Amino acid sequence: MKRILSGIFILLSVLTFSKVSDKKVQRGKNNKLKDVELVFILDRSGSMQGLESDTIGGYNSMLLKQKKEKTGKVSVTTVLFDDQYELLYNQVPIDKIAPMTEKEYYVRGSTALLDAIGKTIMQIKANQEKKGNSEKVLFVIITDGMENASREYRLDTVKKLIEERKEKDKWEFLFLGANIDAIGTAGRLGIDSSRAAQYKSDKQGTVKNYEVLNEAIKEVRSGNELKDSWKKEIEEDVKNRGK
């Protein structure tokens, strides 16, 4: 009798685990994320001169498209950086985000990339300590120059922060870089090569960035794992037109 009961218990355990596993696999198809936090860290140092309108237009267009996606709650944090740091939006609901203009985005100064990333990670952590964790956090870092002005954060410190958040909270980090070794730079920051892309720093390349990011964000919001091919169009653009 004990053997029979034991066998029934094992069978029920296997069936229960199988159902739970199936639900996890199917999550992307049937259970879209309810709470996503988008975090943009945008370079506005002097090397971005001439691309102001394209950056503003690309960013605004991307957010407008995301506003039309009626998938769960989305908040936006946007940081503009050069050798100074500006927190433009801090965890603002996406439907309350006003279009960015040349009053906010204008180029100047040098590139304090490490400070921008480090400060923003700490800001998001502080936000979540007050309001609770979002179901998913997606960082998007865009820069067209080498780090040359950070004073508060070092490379090893930022790398540790990124790796901790990826490991503990499953944060996602995307890195888009121009005029640098984007893949190598991302790797030194603790960001996988599959999540980094080299782009061409001109009008077409800038517009392409935001078009591709829009699709990547849609994929993340759907609850699916972001495929390594998310950056294919950016890489093809560089391949066809050069860096």
Where do the model's predicted regions map?
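Positively charged n-region of N-terminal signal peptides that target proteins for export
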Residues: 1-4
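Acidic, low-complexity intrinsically disordered regions
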Residues: 6-7, 11-243
